């Protein structure tokens, strides 16, 4: 789908919303405790109106356009110093979200060191089962035997304390047809899941995709055989036509799914948080257009505007994240053609920044050598966005020119913040290039190369610390 086609679509969506009020709450079959419109202006600071819903074409049910991604719950320590999910925080966020119309919750057996499903299930089970939809996955990455896959599938029912899963996904397919067949076809799991769908224990069957355009098109050919109920893709205004690495541009994926009438679930609307932490110059431009709105809200409006989008997932760790997204989607104000044109230019600009395309999913973790891989990338990207490009001035002169002074400030800021943000035992210089992490990265980042690049930058800055 070309940008001009999206502009036409967004313009039409905005016009229809204005004429009919479809951007507000919907009346029938909404899983929000029976309320037509969930939430209003009040303690969460929403501007007014209820949550925007999309209609699931299979059962005609209403799904909140804001979906809760359960991969980023707040962590704490137990009495033995082990990382565990802060259950009290999860309960509070789930209660708040449900009360304000969010009814789609997405998890996986591998999220948060395998703790996400149980913590999410405990929080949700305190509410009526018909007030929310559960989405989870068959995440059989390392052991795709039928025995292990069946155990993982059965465990999800136990973790969520339920007799049915509303949305079930084959997790992160797209590396190769061989990988897809090994994980799901040859072991008989896909045939089994199709029967589970017929029996009603799975209500919607789909998959999440990470891969290139060729693989996307190949897998989509299976729709005639398997009749996918939905497909989850990475979509945001940066990846619409500027996807990195092996990933397919979102405009192509969305366009092909829309043609076939397959509902789309959106992941990474903020691109791992990077679209909430933009270069200062771009932040100024966004604030000039809409001073009262958050930087993140632009990305969420982009992801939610297309009408074939069923829900947009957001991993909301803290209450302020949830409240900001509720303001954006209660109700959603679709992008205008002018908005889309502007974000297209922002994306063009962002594609020129030397960022590492890490989304912070942590699939690469833990590193056997203790490196905080996402932390190293996040710090580097943050410094680039804030203008600390730490490019050494041309020439060998030690003269204190303005350019040299700027370099000294940037160098010091980078080094000080690096040591504060990343423990020394977790820094990039510990990478030996074993490559264990690479096969797990859905963005296909050459992780050792990027870590070595960051380490080289750090060492270069430290070597020059006595010169200036």
Predicted feature locations:
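Twin-arginine (Tat) signal peptide motif
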Residues: 1-7, 364, 431-437
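Beta/alpha (TIM)-barrel catalytic core signal, keyed to glycine-rich beta->alpha loops juxtaposed to Asp/Glu
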Residues: 173-410, 439, 444, 449
